[in-house]
């Protein structure tokens, strides 16, 4: 087999040529121009909004806040996600173009926070709805912590392969029984038809014993006679 001899490059040519791969170039362009979607439901968004000011200046990271999901590739779920807000969040995520990333910001977003014990209307973890890339704990996280989370996301983007990013994400995304959602195949189906498994019961279906389970120690007749009103 004939050996192939490559031409010897002079010093000037070596200093003006950068060798890289198309995948690395794509990763560099994406990590340098993350456009976050303005999505906030609680106090954590106040900390994120402070990044826009001159003190932290998150423009130096190439972050451009957008109000449309079709122009964003990053969403920071800042704040509590309620049951009524869950379908809207999934719809916003589905409308974002690929590749897209998610940062779960705050304890309420990650685990439900202080609402995770006995709340009937709070989603206990946003990762039950959409895939999460970076978890940012705190109540609320400081702006410095948000910058650190964005830095970690940039490092993750720098070493990822695009084929791995567009693979089918979680063939079956399951919703907890407590939240009473249907089990759907994927969040990236283009449909946002998550509905409650059981329709809410009306007040007419509630028995009198259940409705008046906790009675006042003073009857209404005694309260009227004593002039309490």
From Swiss-Prot:
Membrane topology: Peripheral membrane protein
Pfam families: Oxidored_q6 (PF01058)
Subcellular location as annotated: Plastid, Chloroplast thylakoid membrane
Molecular functions (GO terms): 4 iron, 4 sulfur cluster binding; iron ion binding; NADH dehydrogenase (ubiquinone) activity; quinone binding
PROSITE patterns membership: COMPLEX1_20K (PS01150)
Gene3D superfamilies linked: 3.40.50.12280
Listed cofactors: [4Fe-4S] cluster
Range of residues in the leader sequence: none
Broadest EC class assigned to this enzyme: translocase
Keywords: 4Fe-4S, Chloroplast, Iron, Iron-sulfur, Membrane, Metal-binding, NAD, NADP, Plastid, Plastoquinone, Quinone, Thylakoid, Translocase, Transport
Cofactor remark: Binds 1 [4Fe-4S] cluster.
Catalytic activity from the UniProt record: a plastoquinone + NADH + (n+1) H(+)(in) = a plastoquinol + NAD(+) + n H(+)(out); a plastoquinone + NADPH + (n+1) H(+)(in) = a plastoquinol + NADP(+) + n H(+)(out)
BP GO terms, sorted: aerobic respiration; electron transport coupled proton transport; photosynthesis, light reaction
Keyword Nucleus appears in the UniProt entry: no
GO CC annotation terms, alphabetical: chloroplast thylakoid membrane; respiratory chain complex I
EC number(s) per entry: 7.1.1.-
Family matches, as NCBIfam families: nuoB_fam (TIGR01957), PRK06411.1 (NF005012)
Subunit: NDH is composed of at least 16 different subunits, 5 of which are encoded in the nucleus.
Function: NDH shuttles electrons from NAD(P)H:plastoquinone, via FMN and iron-sulfur (Fe-S) centers, to quinones in the photosynthetic chain and possibly in a chloroplast respiratory chain. The immediate electron acceptor for the enzyme in this species is believed to be plastoquinone. Couples the redox reaction to proton translocation, and thus conserves the redox energy in a proton gradient.
PANTHER family cross-referenced by the UniProt entry: NADH DEHYDROGENASE (PTHR11995), NADH DEHYDROGENASE [UBIQUINONE] IRON-SULFUR PROTEIN 7, MITOCHONDRIAL (PTHR11995:SF14)
Family (UniProt): Belongs to the complex I 20 kDa subunit family.
Name of the protein in question: NAD(P)H-quinone oxidoreductase subunit K, chloroplastic
Taxonomic classification: Eukaryota, Viridiplantae, Streptophyta, Embryophyta, Tracheophyta
């Amino acid at each position: 087999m004939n050996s192939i001899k490559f031409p010897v490059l002079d010093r000037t040519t070596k200093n003006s040529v950068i060798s890289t791969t198309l995948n690395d170039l794509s990763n560099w362009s994406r990590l340098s121009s993350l456009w976050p979607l303005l999505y906030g439901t609680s106090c954590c968004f106040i900390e994120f909004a402070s990044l826009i000011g001159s003190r932290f200046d998150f423009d130096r990271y190439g972050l451009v806040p957008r109000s449309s999901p079709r122009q964003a590739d990053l969403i920071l779920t800042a704040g509590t996600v309620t049951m009524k807000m869950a379908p809207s969040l999934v719809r916003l995520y589905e409308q974002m173009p690929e590749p897209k990333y998610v940062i779960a910001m705050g304890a309420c977003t990650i685990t439900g926070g202080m609402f995770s014990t006995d709340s009937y209307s709070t989603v206990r973890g946003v990762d039950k709805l959409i895939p999460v890339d970076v978890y940012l704990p705190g109540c609320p996280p400081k702006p410095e912590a948000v910058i650190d989370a964005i830095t970690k996301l940039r490092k993750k983007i720098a070493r990822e392969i695009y084929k791995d990013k567009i693979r089918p994400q979680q063939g079956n995304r399951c919703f907890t029984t407590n939240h009473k959602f249907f089990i759907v195949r994927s969040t990236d189906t283009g449909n946002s038809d998550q509905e409650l498994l059981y329709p809410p019961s009306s007040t007419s279906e509630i028995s009198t014993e259940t409705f008046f389970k906790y009675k006042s120690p003073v009857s209404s007749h005694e309260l009227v006679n004593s002039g309490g009103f």
